[in-house]
C-alpha cells in the first residue's frame, strides 16, 4: 500500500521537524539529496517512487509541508531504501557515510554564471521570503494564544479518568479477537497528516482511511481531543499495539490523530471530517 504524509510543519514556534525518524531502522540506507531550488530534487524522488510502484513495490511519499505538490522524501519499505531532500529547513546528513547513507548533489547541474544584477535580485527575494515566513510564524503564534484563551480547561484528573475508561473499552472492542496485537515495525512512528501550506490548511484524511477502516472522530469543541488522543495512544501501546502518532502542525505538542494500523482502527480530531466516522463527544 502506498502512503503519503508530512514530516515537517510550519508551527507557532517556526519549522518543526520529525525527519530524525526517517529511514533510520536497522538495515535502512538513506541517500541525502543536496542542491538549491529548481535542481529537480522532488522530480528525482517522484521518479524513484514511480519506478518502485511499476515493479510492484509500495512507496511512502513525504510531502513538503510548505508546498504539498512537492516531495521532500520517498521510502521503499521492501528495499529499506530512502531518499530525502537534505536542504534547509530540514538539513539532514548521513549518520555513517558509506555504511547507512550517502549523498547525491543535484546542484552540480545548476546553470551558473549569473550577473551581479541577478545576484542582487536573488538576495532581495531571499530577504523577502524570510520576512514573510517570520510574519507567518508570528500569526500562527498569535492564533495559538487565542485558542488557549477561548477553549475552556475542563479536563482535570476526574474527567481524564472517566475518558480513559471509555477509550479503554473502545480499544478492547477494536483489538483483534485472535490476540494479534503485538507491536510491529512502523516506519516513522511520528508524523503529520495535517499541514498549514501555501494551499491553505490541508488534511490527508484519505491516508488515515487507508490504514484504518474504523475511525473514531473526537469532537473538540471543548478542547478535549488532545487529551483523549494521548490517552488512546497510551492505552493502545499498553495493550501491545503499534501506534502512529500524528501531531498538530500549528502546535506539535498536541496530538491530531492516533492510528493503529494493525487493528485497522484510528482516532482523529474533528478537523479531518471523515465521512462515516464514529463520533466521541
Residues covered by each model-derived region:
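Extended intrinsically disordered terminal tails
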Residues: 19-20, 64, 148-150, 154-157, ...
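Conserved nucleotide-sensing/catalytic segment adjacent to the nucleotide-binding pocket
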Residues: 1-14, 49-116, 120-121, 234-281
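Glycine-rich phosphate-binding P-loop
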Residues: 30-49, 201-236
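An accessory alpha-helical subdomain
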Residues: 121-177
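Generic recognition of cysteine residues
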Residues: 23-24, 64, 143, 160, ...
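N-terminal pre-Walker A segment at the start of P-loop NTPase domains
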Residues: 1-22, 161-207
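Residue-level preference for short coil/turn positions at secondary-structure junctions
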Residues: 26-27, 211-212, 263
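A generic N-terminal leader/anchor concept
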Residues: 1-54
Amino acid at each position: 500500500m502506498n502512503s503519503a504524509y508530512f514530516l515537517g510543519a510550519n508551527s507557532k514556534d517556526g519549522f518543526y521537524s520529525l525527519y530524525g525518524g526517517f529511514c533510520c531502522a536497522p538495515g535502512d540506507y538513506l541517500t541525502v539529496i543536496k542542491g538549491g531550488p529548481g535542481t529537480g530534487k522532488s522530480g528525482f524522488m517522484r521518479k524513484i517512487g514511480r519506478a518502485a510502484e511499476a515493479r510492484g513495490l509500495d512507496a511512502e511519499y513525504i510531502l513538503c509541508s510548505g508546498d504539498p505538490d512537492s516531495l521532500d522524501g520517498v521510502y521503499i519499505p521492501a528495499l529499506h531504501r530512502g531518499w530525502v531532500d537534505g536542504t534547509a529547513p530540514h538539513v539532514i546528513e548521513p549518520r555513517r557515510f558509506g555504511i547507512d547513507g550517502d549523498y547525491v548533489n543535484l546542484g552540480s547541474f545548476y546553470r551558473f554564471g549569473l550577473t551581479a544584477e541577478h545576484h542582487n535580485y536573488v538576495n532581495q527575494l531571499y530577504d523577502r521570503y524570510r520576512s514573510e515566513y517570520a510574519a507567518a510564524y508570528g500569526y500562527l503564534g498569535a492564533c495559538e494564544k487565542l485558542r488557549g484563551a477561548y477553549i475552556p480547561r475542563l479536563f482535570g484528573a476526574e474527567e481524564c479518568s472517566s475518558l480513559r475508561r471509555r477509550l479503554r473499552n473502545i480499544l478492547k472492542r477494536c483489538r483483534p479477537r485472535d490476540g494479534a496485537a503485538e507491536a510491529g515495525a512502523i516506519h516513522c512512528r511520528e508524523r503529520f497528516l495535517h499541514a498549514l501550506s501555501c494551499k491553505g490548511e490541508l488534511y490527508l484524511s484519505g491516508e488515515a482511511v487507508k490504514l484504518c477502516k474504523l475511525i473514531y472522530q473526537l469532537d473538540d469543541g471543548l478542547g478535549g481531543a488532545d487529551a483523549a488522543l494521548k490517552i488512546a495512544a497510551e492505552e493502545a501501546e499498553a495493550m501491545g499495539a503499534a501506534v502512529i502518532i500524528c501531531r498538530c502542525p500549528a502546535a506539535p505538542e498536541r496530538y491530531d490523530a492516533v492510528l493503529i494500523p494493525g487493528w485497522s482502527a484510528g482516532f482523529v480530531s474533528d478537523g479531518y471530517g471523515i465521512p462515516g466516522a464514529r463520533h466521541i463527544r
